[in-house]
Amino acid sequence: MTLRISAPILNFADGRLGDGLPQIAWQRHYTVDDQPIAAAFGRVLSDRMADLIDVAMAVYVADRLRRREPSPRSDPFRLGWSRTMCIRLGVREPAVWRSTEVRARLGAVLGWLTEDDWNFDFVKRTKPQRPSQAQGFLFATAPQAPATVGLFSGGLDSLVGAAELVDRPSAGDLILISASSSTRLRGLQTQLARRLRSRGKTVISVRVPFNLTGATSPDLHEISQRSRGFVFLALGSAAAVTAGTTDLRLFENGIGAVNLPYLECQVGTHSTRSAHPATLRLFMDLLRALQFPLQISNPYFWLTKAEVCSRLPTQFHDLVGISESCDGFPQRVEGQPRCGICTACVLRAQALTVSGLSHLEDWSRYRRAPLLALAEGGADSWPGRAMLYQVEVLRSALEANEPWAAALDAFPSLARLPGNLEDGPLGRQIARSELLSLLRRYVHEWDSVNKVGGYRERVSLPDHVTKGGVA
């Protein structure tokens, strides 16, 4: 198949195929080392799984190399956000990837995650295999059943998820799969996994580095990176399938997974969807089309972040300070403090305070103590104030005579949730009720924190911030 679309084609295939398209090459322009997955279990990756990782990396690289259009004042809702993406990629099983079902499933999950139109030209791969496929193993290393594979970011939610599994006597081996483009973040993940392992459970830590290389200019990279969730799910699936399990878990509180917009100017994928229930279902649809019957679940979806924190077993309290939430962590110089003003820092502080675990945090490691910065106001407190603005919008909807209808009016993206959580009319009705309960508990948590800080006085934001001008 030849792509006949006016958008430029990003060529990841072998050579130029006679049409003069420059090649975007592994190791020269980007790297991914999936060898740790094969080495952890003594099994080479299957052709189809290796292809899935190649597809994920091509998507990630294309996402980074094609800038989204800047938002002029005439386009306050950033309708020019979406792009047409055209990729030529060499795969080991082109017939599989050219099939109607696989194309449809791939386009559906990528379109939902990035709000871009993705077009692929799959050709036969002729490059040598990567080490994850080329190196044979004398003995397979099967994890002790029932093994659990979980995505592990090094944040609070994934720490609690891993700690609960380590603390559970009946659970088998725990496999933590981490993927990162930051050397420092991989070091933190390694440290946490080592500390978890020291508590007696077999913890297999699999870390997969990936990144763009110096052959591309960082100044030209797209920073939104909405495709990262696809990479994480692909690598997590590769680990689960290679380990011989049929389940993959990610650990994300429900408020973070739904990720409702804070402000009116945030439309569609301006809010990330990496852990959204629709993302998990669409990705599982793709896996089924590829003949991988993997179940992906989020056991913390019906909990707030504070409720997740409250489940942390006491013996792991000392690991809270090692975990990391700050959005700016990968870019920070070692030894520099957390920012304390990003939404991730603010929500972490709120959750630790509400759960009664704030004493476990070393607040001197923040440039500004998050809740104090929010109480004091100032120009750099707008992310936290945006969170409070969202809380007040939620409060108004939840106090209405028809709370679900009011919530849908305020946050139209909620409409997609019930059908991705439960099947059938009754199931969707139950899901709506549970979602309203989750949102009410979240609002009440902020009320309990507000009694001390008086944060509701800081809710007001200028119209140009709530309705446009802020990404």
Q: Model-flagged regions — what are they?
A:
Residues T2-I24, A40-L45, N259-L260, E264-G268, ...:
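ATP/NTP-dependent adenylation/nucleotidyl-transfer catalytic domains that generate, transfer
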Residues S153:
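Conserved adenosyl
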Residues G42-L45, I177-D318:
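ATP-dependent adenylate-handling ligase core
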Residues W97, P128-Q135, G214-L220, T304-R311, ...:
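Short, solvent-exposed polar/charged micro-motifs at secondary-structure junctions
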Residues M1-G150, A162-L212, N450-V452, V459, ...:
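RNA-binding accessory domains that recognize and position tRNA/RNA substrates
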Residues D157-G161:
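Hydrophobic positions on the alpha1 helix immediately C-terminal to the Walker A/P-loop
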Residues R66-L79, A240-L248, L352-L357:
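Short helix-capping/linker segments at secondary-structure and domain boundaries
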